[in-house]
Amino acid sequence: MERIKELRNLMSQSRTREILTKTTVDHMAIIKKYTSGRQEKNPSLRMKWMMAMKYPITADKRITEMVPERNEQGQTLWSKMSDAGSDRVMVSPLAVTWWNRNGPVTSTVHYPKVYKTYFDKVERLKHGTFGPVHFRNQVKIRRRVDINPGHADLSAKEAQDVIMEVVFPNEVGARILTSESQLTITKEKKEELQNCKISPLMVAYMLERELVRKTRFLPVAGGTSSMYIEVLHLTQGTCWEQMYTPGGEVRNDDVDQSLIIAARNIVRRAAVSADPLASLLEMCHSTQIGGTRMVDILRQNPTEEQAVDICKAAMGLRISSSFSFGGFTFKRTSGSSIKREEEVLTGNLQTLKIKVHEGYEEFTMVGKRATAILRKATRRLVQLIVSGRDEQSIAEAIIVAIVFSQEDCMIKAVRGDLNFVNRANQRLNPMHQLLRHFQKDAKVLFQNWGIEHIDNVMGMVGVLPDMTPSTEMSMRGIRVSKMGVDEYSSTERVVVSIDRFLRVRDQRGNVLLSPEEVSETQGTERLTITYSSSMMWEINGPESVLVNTYQWIIRNWETVKIQWSQNPTMLYNKMEFEPFQSLVPKAIRGQYSGFVRTLFQQMRDVLGTFDTTQIIKLLPFAAAPPKQSRMQFSSLTVNVRGSGMRILVRGNSPVFNYNKTTKRLTILGKDAGTLIEDPDESTSGVESAVLRGFLILGKEDRRYGPALSINELSNLTKGEKANVLIGQGDVVLVMKRKRDSSILTDSQTATKRIRMAIN
């Protein structure tokens, strides 16, 4: 206060004011501070000071011919004085106004194209709806968010190459455009920007906005997709929020959302297959999201979500070093620990082997609806500070933290046996067993935890076992805070390894992620996800499995046909028939398979019985391990539409219907494609006789005895000749092949030879 009084005193003397306002600044240090370097030290002051001058702007000399010296009001628009240090003229801000009103108009066609991101934003805001303003305490936490709606996901280097190629195509310098997206964008932009008069530098800046994801670490309460972030200043203050629904959608948000859904579906499906890692990779490589290959998106998209990170790890990409437990992202902020196996007894006297972390550590926990700071020692929770949207969210965080602490009273709070299994029916590891148990019911856990008296600390309240707030008491070591805990800000990525059960570990062997951590939440993807892998056929239910299986056979019929006759076992083991098995009643799968395989063998052995439609119809049933039995079936049951439906062995049914005239196959009334039968099939007789394993030598030769029937042929030894009765009573001489390898050619040559032998 004294200083201020003294200064006021000084200022009241006129001499002081004169010295301060009139004296030149000639202290070297000050001059140096404000004149060294190109960087403006006080931009806003400079701007105000410049704009207070009469001619603060410099312009090219040509302006004097294009703009009059005075405007209609008689104000001077430019000065006859040249700018010191350049051959430009000094111009008044009024000249800009005159130019905007009366200057030449050029073509505006390129503006919406170059400034696309701005035009799009205006459209989104025009169609967005702003709701009421609510006044309430905002729990904001800093998260890394995308601040640039509507961008492609190119890396900075890829974008730089595209921009150089589009804006400065004649500049020297090697540019390699390799990725699909780079080539498409370059072609598109070159066409759009032909004869564009906007300054190349501006075009380059705007292209960068369109091509690269820009992220910032911002305090957010609520939506984090880029469409919400662009109106952050309108939707949340320190003590208020305004509801907002975006108008329209932007591709980058749609890609992020659809990628998460695809990754979750793929990880869930892979986890239950025989070789989860191989299956996961096969599915990632054969899936497209909005027409772009999923693996390309994974390489470029920085989204951090458990399933997405598992897919990235499988592809050998780096991921964040934080780990996931109970749906929360944990990041260790200090301390260290070593792992040791320990056997513990639950309240139900069940023995659990847990990996105990020995040592003092501090973590931040960040979830979708709650965040926390956790301090723990060996099997002891020291302190937990939680903040969340509501009681439910806070309870979820507390359960996860308590289980993670591995305290004895938590393990003793278990009632009943722990036998939770994952989707593949394997037992979960002990830590996830405990987590699932208490997520189902945490009453005993909270009651047994213990409570303590608390001191009054600003911004903190206690929480009782029934999750109500209190200022006097709280669960031991646990407090609820008004302030959120910021997400981990670093974008550092680490090298990880993944085992065949999809457990992701860092280089020190700590498990960062596992399929148990993948959310079960179902959503509807905003972009079309096309899973080409047969493993994903069942995602849309039994009907989709049925249709996809038959479509696959039809699409690959030429190779399937060859395998059917030459190497049936390999065909039956194809993974494309795996999903179909879930439609066949378990008890009878083996019998069906045995029956169909026998039927197929007869078809191979008996001339003229090859039947394309029947083979296609029954093939999926032959994939199950066969049981030998004498059972014959006239129809086979599949479980679709909530009940058993029949496929007739001979003839059409609602499930499988082949129209001979139109050559179309319909499955459950849905068109499944065109099915072309072999030319020989429709005209049975000599033409359809396919003597597999026999060479036709010519016409009947009496020296080899009476004509045998086709069934008697099987008794011949290799190289032995015989007459055989085929088709409509014609007889030809055949020899049983010495080698099996040429069997397939028989079906092609047999028809020709038979015709020659008979004619």
Swiss-Prot record:
Span of the annotated motif Nuclear localization signal: 736-739
Gene3D superfamilies the record matches: Polymerase Basic Protein 2, C-terminal domain
UniProt xrefs under InterPro entries: Flu_PB2_2nd, Flu_PB2_6th, Flu_PB2_C, Flu_PB2_CAP-bd, Flu_PB2_middle, Flu_PB2_N, INV_PB2, PB2_helical
One GO BP annotation of this record: cap snatching
Cell location: Virion; Host nucleus; Host mitochondrion
Gene Ontology cellular component list: host cell mitochondrion; host cell nucleus; virion component
GO MF entries: RNA binding; RNA-directed RNA polymerase activity
Domain of life of the source: Viruses
Entry keyword set: Cap snatching, Eukaryotic host gene expression shutoff by virus, Eukaryotic host transcription shutoff by virus, Host gene expression shutoff by virus, Host mitochondrion, Host nucleus, Host-virus interaction, Inhibition of host innate immune response by virus, Inhibition of host MAVS by virus, Inhibition of host RLR pathway by virus, Inhibition of host RNA polymerase II by virus, mRNA capping, mRNA processing, Viral immunoevasion, Viral transcription, Virion
Site positions per UniProt: Mammalian adaptation: K627
Function of the protein: Plays an essential role in transcription initiation and cap-stealing mechanism, in which cellular capped pre-mRNAs are used to generate primers for viral transcription. Recognizes and binds the 7-methylguanosine-containing cap of the target pre-RNA which is subsequently cleaved after 10-13 nucleotides by the viral protein PA. Plays a role in the initiation of the viral genome replication and modulates the activity of the ribonucleoprotein (RNP) complex.
Quaternary context: Influenza RNA polymerase is composed of three subunits: PB1, PB2 and PA. Interacts (via N-terminus) with PB1 (via C-terminus). Interacts with nucleoprotein NP (via N-terminus). Interacts (via N-terminus) with host MAVS (via N-terminus); this interaction inhibits host innate immune response.
Family recorded in the similarity comment: Belongs to the influenza viruses PB2 family.
Protein name, per record: Polymerase basic protein 2
Gene source species: Influenza A virus (strain A/Memphis/18/1978 H3N2)
Gene: PB2
